[in-house]
C-alpha cells in the first residue's frame, strides 16, 4: 500500500518538529509541554463558551435505553455542544491543537516512534475491533 500525500505530510511534520525543537528537548520538558498544551486546548474551548458564547455546553446525563443496539447508540449519544465555533474561536482552538500536536510529535521523536505508524496501527485496530473498541 503506497503512502498518500497526507501520510507524507504527517512524516514531514514530525521531521520539522525534530529540527525545530531545541530548548525543550528533554523528555521531561516534552511531557510537561504536552500537559501544558493540552490545558491550552481545553482553555480555548472553555473561552469559546464563557467569553465568546459562540458555543454552549448542555451537559447532562445521557440515557442509554436497554433495548438499544450498538449501532443505535451512536445516534443516541450527544456531543452536548450547541452552536458552532465562530471564526476567531475556531482559529484559536486550531492553533492550540497544533501546539499539542507539535509536542506529541516531539515525544514520538524522543522515543523514536513514528507518529504515522501509531496512527496507522490505531486505525487498523479500530477497523478490526469495530464496535468492540468503544471509547
Q: Over which residues does each language-model region extend?
A:
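Flexible "arm" and connector segments at domain edges
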Residues: 1-97, 101-135
Amino acid at each position: 500500500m503506497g503512502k498518500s500525500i497526507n501520510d507524507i505530510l504527517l512524516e514531514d511534520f514530525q521531521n520539522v518538529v525534530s529540527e525545530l525543537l531545541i530548548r525543550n528537548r528533554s523528555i521531561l520538558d516534552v511531557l510537561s509541554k504536552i500537559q501544558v498544551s493540552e490545558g491550552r486546548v481545553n482553555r480555548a474551548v472553555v473561552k469559546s463558551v464563557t467569553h465568546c458564547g459562540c458555543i454552549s455546553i448542555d451537559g447532562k446525563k445521557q440515557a442509554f435505553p436497554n433495548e438499544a443496539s450498538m449501532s443505535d447508540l451512536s445516534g443516541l449519544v450527544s456531543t452536548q455542544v450547541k452552536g458552532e465555533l465562530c471564526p476567531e474561536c475556531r482559529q484559536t482552538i486550531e492553533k492550540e491543537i497544533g501546539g499539542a500536536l507539535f509536542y506529541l510529535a516531539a515525544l514520538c521523536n524522543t522515543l523514536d516512534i513514528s507518529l504515522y505508524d501509531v496512527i496507522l496501527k490505531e486505525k487498523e485496530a479500530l477497523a478490526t475491533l469495530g464496535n468492540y473498541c468503544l471509547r
